[in-house]
């Protein structure tokens, strides 16, 4: 391999250099082509992978399980009820047990400190499948997807993230674009901007890569000339209704709708979303939002945009599997 990523963990977006990150994207594209052509070779035969999910997931779990299956690895899935981590057993002790049984561990949960503790004590690679602070595996897929849907070099791609920018997706899209030298626009209400900690990381990376960075509360300014518009959900299950009401009122001007897509001035602008998306009333939460707040045509994105040709969120979701496979092969492969 061109780069030696063997036995490396992935805990934050900035853990890898731009060249290492680009290598993972290139490897993912090669593995994707091989899967489509049915010429894929197994590089993880006999490996044991543990997936710890304190937060449930569709895409992350399926991406890891299919990637492992394709590459010959075995998987143990620990759901929120199937692990004692943080309840009866500390992250440190869990790491020291699982590290003796598995070749790698994936963790998806709230705690960034938790996943970092796993990596410190497990003695095997640990992958952050999502925490409250970062979503690094999603970023490899997002960069791959933008590259596939643009004829520009990665460093010339322009994208905006619109919405709650202090979220794990807000942090991650802020940082990955600055890492890779891209044109990054982060847009949301000032009260929901990334903290100084994340802005400082982004600015340091920007100085190294030559990235262009805008943080603004003006959606039309943010999307001008962009190739891609990203967003994510505004609310989460388990939050108090008062929080939902306040946040929805605050973020309604930041909904991705046909008008905002057109404001880019680029008819080829694509829409991206890590999913799930609240774009209609066909889910329990979607119907609840419609009933309580009168937003029957979607929350963070309208159904019109979501069902349009501009939406590439499903290609983005597929690429989760190819990029996670690349990460596994690069860090564990023979």
Curated annotation (Swiss-Prot):
Binding site for L-ornithine: 168, 232, 236-237
Record's keyword terms, sorted: Arginine metabolism, Cytoplasm, Plasmid, Transferase
Pfam families reported for this sequence: OTCace, OTCace_N
Pathway named in the protein's UniProt entry: Amino-acid degradation; L-arginine degradation via ADI pathway; carbamoyl phosphate from L-arginine: step 2/2
Domain of life: Bacteria
Reaction(s) catalysed (UniProt annotation): carbamoyl phosphate + L-ornithine = L-citrulline + phosphate + H(+)
EC class: transferase
EC number: 2.1.3.3
MF terms (GO), sorted A to Z: amino acid binding; ornithine carbamoyltransferase activity
Gene Ontology cellular component terms for the protein in this record: cytoplasm
PROSITE patterns, alphabetized: CARBAMOYLTRANSFERASE
InterPro entries with a match to the protein in the record: Asp/Orn_carbamoyltranf_P-bd (IPR006132), Asp/Orn_carbamoylTrfase (IPR006130), Asp/Orn_carbamoylTrfase_sf (IPR036901), Asp_carbamoyltransf_Asp/Orn-bd (IPR006131), Orn/put_carbamltrans (IPR002292), OTCase_ArgI (IPR024904)
Subcellular location: Cytoplasm
GO term, biological process aspect, one: arginine biosynthetic process via ornithine
Function in brief: Reversibly catalyzes the transfer of the carbamoyl group from carbamoyl phosphate (CP) to the N(epsilon) atom of ornithine (ORN) to produce L-citrulline.
Family: Belongs to the aspartate/ornithine carbamoyltransferase superfamily. OTCase family.
Listed name of the protein: Ornithine carbamoyltransferase, catabolic
Organism: Rhizobium meliloti (strain 1021) (Ensifer meliloti)
Encoding gene (name): arcB
